[in-house]
Swiss-Prot record:
GO cellular component terms, A-Z: chloroplast
Subcellular location per the Swiss-Prot or TrEMBL entry: Plastid, Chloroplast
PANTHER family in the record: SENESCENCE-ASSOCIATED PROTEIN AAF, CHLOROLPLASTIC
Family the entry assigns: Belongs to the ATA15/OSA15 family.
Organism: Oryza sativa subsp. japonica
Described purpose of this protein according to its UniProt entry: May be involved in the regulation of leaf senescence.
InterPro entries: AAF-like, ARM-type_fold, WH_DNA-bd_sf
GO terms for biological process, alphabetical: cellular response to oxidative stress; leaf senescence
Protein's UniProt name: Senescence-associated protein OSA15, chloroplastic
UniProtKB keywords: Chloroplast, Plastid, Transit peptide
Protein's gene: OSA15
Length: 457
C-alpha cells in the first residue's frame, strides 16, 4: 500500500504468514526522502492479528498535504519503506535504511506471541514509544542526509571547478603553442624572404656584369672591325701619309726659314768684310788669323768653333748691329711665336751677340712677356747656349728672372739651364783652366809661333 505526498511517496508493506495470516519479520526501514516524518500513528485490531496504521499529517496551513500510510504491527519487528522521488526544488533521489533491533515493537512482538490480545492502554503506550523513537531516528537520518548532500555538492563543485581550471590551463597551453608556432613560421618566412632577396640581388648583379662584359666585347669587336675596314679602304694609310706630309712640310718651312735667315746674315757679314778690306787696301783676310781655346784638365773646349780673326770679329759685330736694326724694324718676325723666338735667340747665340743693345731689350721684353709659351721658349733657347761666356750678362740675367717665374715649367727649365752652365765653371781640387790664343801666319816662310798660356787654379 502506498500513499503519495507532494514531493514524497511513502509505501509500507506487511508480509503475512500463509497459515495464520501473521506478519513475518522485516529487515528494517528503507526511506528515500529528506522530509519523511510520521506525525500520527493509529493501531487497528484485526481478526487474525494486529495491524497498525501510521498516518502522516502535515499542516495544510504551511502549504503541505496530509497523507496516510497503513502498516501492520508484527511480533518479530517492523518494516517501513519510504520512497521519495524528489521535492519541488530538487530532482535527486536519496535512499536511507534504518534497522533497529531493540525497538519497542520487539516487546510488542514477544507479547503478541504469549497472548492473543492487547489492551487499549498497552497499545497507546507502545504507540507513544514508537512515535518518539521514530522521530529521533528520522531527525538523525535527515541530518546525515543533509550533510551527505552538502558534502556531495561541495565535491561536485570542487570537481567542476578543477575541470574548469584544467580546461583553462589546456586552452592557455594551446594558445601559447599556437603563438609559438606562429612566431616560428614568421621567423622562417622572414629568413626565406631574406634569402630570396639576397639571391635575387646577386642574380641581378651577375646579370648586369654579364651584360656589361658583353657590351664591352661587342664595342671592342665593332671598333676593331671599323679599324680593319678603315685600313682596308686605305683611309687610315691616307691619314698617315697626310700627317707625315704635314710634318715634313712644317720641317721644311722651318729649315728654309733658318737657311734664309742665315743666308741674309752671311750676306750682310760678307758685305761688311768687303767694305772693311776696301778701306784698308793692304790688308787681306788671310793676313792674320787666330782662335781662342779653353782647356780644362787636358780637355779642350772651343769657345769659337772656327778660326776667327780680329777683323772678322769686328765685321761680325757691325753686321749684327745692322741685322738687329733690320729685325727690330721688320714686320716678318713675330716675337710672340715660340718657334721664331727660339730661332732668333739661337742665331744671336751663334753670333755671340747676346750683350748688344738690341739683344738686351729683346731678352728683357720676352722674359717679362705675359704669354707663358713665349717665356718657356726663351728659357729653352737660352738653355741651348754652350757656356755662360756666350750668354753674357744679358742672357744670364734673363735666365735668373725666368728661374723665379710663377709658372712651374718655365722656372724648372731656367733653373736646369743655370745649373748646367754653372757646372762648367765648378773647379774641384786638382782642376786647372787654361786659355790659349793661336796665331797662324799665311806666309810660307815663317814658322808657327806658340802663344803664352795662363794657368788658373
Amino acid at each position: 500500500m502506498a500513499t503519495r505526498i507532494p514531493g514524497t511517496v511513502a509505501a509500507s508493506g506487511v508480509y503475512y504468514n500463509d497459515q495464520y495470516r501473521m506478519p513475518c519479520k522485516l529487515k528494517g526501514i528503507h526511506c528515500m526522502a529528506l522530509n519523511c516524518i510520521p506525525q500520527k500513528a493509529k493501531v487497528r485490531k484485526c481478526m487474525n492479528g494486529y495491524q497498525s496504521t501510521f498516518r502522516f499529517c502535515v499542516n495544510e496551513k504551511n502549504g503541505q498535504t496530509t497523507g496516510q500510510s497503513n502498516g501492520s504491527l508484527i511480533q518479530q519487528g517492523q518494516n517501513f519503506r519510504c520512497h521519495s522521488y524528489g521535492s519541488h526544488n530538487s530532482s535527486e533521489t536519496k535512499e536511507c535504511s534504518l534497522e533497529d533491533g531493540t525497538d519497542s515493537y520487539r516487546d510488542f512482538e514477544e507479547h503478541s506471541r504469549g497472548a492473543s490480545q492487547f489492551s487499549d492502554n498497552q497499545v497507546a503506550a507502545k504507540k507513544k514509544s514508537v512515535k518518539s523513537s521514530q522521530g529521533l531516528a528520522e531527525a538523525c537520518k535527515f541530518v546525515y542526509n543533509d550533510a551527505k548532500f552538502v558534502n556531495e555538492r561541495a565535491q561536485n563543485d570542487i570537481l567542476l571547478l578543477s575541470r574548469g581550471i584544467t580546461r583553462l590551463n589546456k586552452r592557455a597551453c594551446q594558445d601559447v603553442a599556437v603563438l609559438g608556432s606562429g612566431f616560428l613560421k614568421l621567423d622562417a618566412r622572414a629568413r626565406k624572404d631574406t634569402k630570396k632577396i639576397d639571391h635575387s640581388v646577386k642574380e641581378r648583379a651577375a646579370r648586369l656584369t654579364h651584360f656589361a662584359r658583353i657590351l664591352k666585347e661587342q664595342a671592342q669587336s665593332d671598333l676593331k672591325k671599323a679599324a680593319d675596314q678603315h685600313w682596308s679602304d686605305g683611309a687610315l694609310e691616307a691619314d698617315l701619309r697626310r700627317a707625315d706630309s704635314v710634318v715634313r712640310r712644317r720641317a721644311m718651312e722651318d729649315a728654309f726659314m733658318a737657311l734664309k735667315f742665315v743666308r741674309d746674315i752671311h750676306d750682310m757679314m760678307a758685305n761688311r768684310l768687303q767694305e772693311q778690306f776696301a778701306k784698308d787696301g793692304s790688308s787681306s783676310p788671310a793676313n792674320s788669323r787666330s782662335f781662342i781655346t779653353l782647356e780644362k784638365n787636358g780637355n779642350t773646349f772651343e769657345l769659337f768653333p772656327h778660326e776667327v780673326s780680329t777683323d772678322q770679329i769686328t765685321a761680325i759685330e757691325q753686321a749684327y748691329w745692322s741685322m738687329a736694326s733690320a729685325l727690330s724694324e721688320a714686320d716678318g718676325i713675330d716675337y710672340t711665336d715660340p718657334e721664331e723666338l727660339e730661332l732668333l735667340v739661337a742665331t744671336l747665340i751663334d753670333l755671340d751677340a747676346m750683350d748688344g743693345k738690341k739683344s738686351v731689350s729683346l731678352l728683357a721684353e720676352c722674359s717679362s712677356s705675359p704669354d707663358v709659351n713665349t717665356r718657356k721658349a726663351l728659357a729653352n733657347a737660352l738653355a741651348a747656349a754652350p757656356s755662360m761666356w756666350i750668354l753674357g750678362n744679358a742672357g744670364m740675367g734673363a735666365l735668373q728672372r725666368l728661374a723665379q717665374d710663377s709658372n712651374y715649367a718655365v722656372a724648372r727649365a731656367a733653373t736646369r739651364a743655370i745649373n748646367e752652365l754653372t757646372k762648367q765653371w765648378e773647379l774641384e781640387e786638382g782642376d786647372s783652366l787654361r786659355f790659349v790664343l793661336n796665331q797662324n801666319m799665311v806666309s810660307k816662310e815663317t814658322a808657327d809661333d806658340s802663344a803664352a798660356a795662363d794657368d788658373t787654379r
